[in-house]
């Protein structure tokens, strides 16, 4: 398997250069992505990186701390996806693209999505390495659609946008809806009318 060989090389390279912490996070992220967070352990991450448990515990106090780091990485991936999807767009087009990128992430990475929100809940302001919070493009779009874009973003409009988008994404990540379910576009369309009825 080419992907597994690549991961082994990446792990060895990361540790060789002294970046064991990043190697452990990468290993844990791949495990969560494929099998979920429940069956993972810090000792397993250490074995995967080819180091002792003691070496791993120098970077993470326990499994919970490692999984929090993985959740932060998951939010960074979501933010990157959102930024790419909304590049060059504004207003309603940005809002729609941002919402779909969020939903697409939940469909493509359901286990990472669930882990991220089990750790951070609705607080999507987490930033890492200069990457804006996962919800930033949705917030910017809501602000652009306000009657007076110069004013602070309307918290009620933002809450509505997040509640609808996150609700859809959660249903998809749990397997209750499919990404192409007609209710997805219907729910987005209705919520967008509530956010910017005249635009």
Regions found by a protein language model. Give the residues of each.
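N-terminal intrinsically disordered/low-complexity leader segments
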Residues: 1-19
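Helix-turn-helix
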Residues: 23, 27, 31-65
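Amphipathic alpha-helical segments enriched in hydrophobic/aromatic and basic residues
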Residues: 32, 41-42, 63-74, 113, ...
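Helical hydrophobic small-molecule/effector-binding pocket
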Residues: 96-117, 125-132, 162
């Amino acid at each position: 398997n080419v992907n597994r060989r690549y991961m082994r090389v990446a792990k060895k390279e990361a540790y060789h250069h002294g970046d064991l912490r990043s190697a452990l996070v990468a290993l844990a992220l791949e495990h969560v992505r494929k099998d979920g967070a429940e069956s993972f352990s810090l000792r397993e991450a250490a074995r995967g990186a080819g180091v002792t448990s003691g070496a791993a515990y120098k970077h993470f106090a326990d499994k919970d701390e490692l999984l929090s780091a993985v959740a932060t990485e998951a939010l960074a991936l979501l933010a990157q996806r959102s930024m790419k999807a909304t590049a060059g767009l504004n207003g309603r087009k940005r809002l729609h693209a941002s919402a779909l990128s969020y939903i697409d992430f939940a469909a493509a990475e359901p286990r990472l999505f669930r882990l991220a929100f089990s750790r951070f809940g609705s607080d999507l302001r987490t930033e890492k390495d200069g990457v804006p919070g996962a919800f930033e493009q949705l917030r910017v779009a809501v602000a652009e659609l306000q009657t007076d874009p110069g004013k602070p973003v309307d918290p009620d409009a933002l809450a509505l946008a997040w509640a609808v988008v996150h609700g859809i994404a959660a249903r998809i990540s749990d397997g209750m809806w499919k990404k192409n379910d007609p209710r997805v576009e219907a729910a987005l369309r209705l919520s967008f009318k509530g956010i910017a009825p005249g635009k």
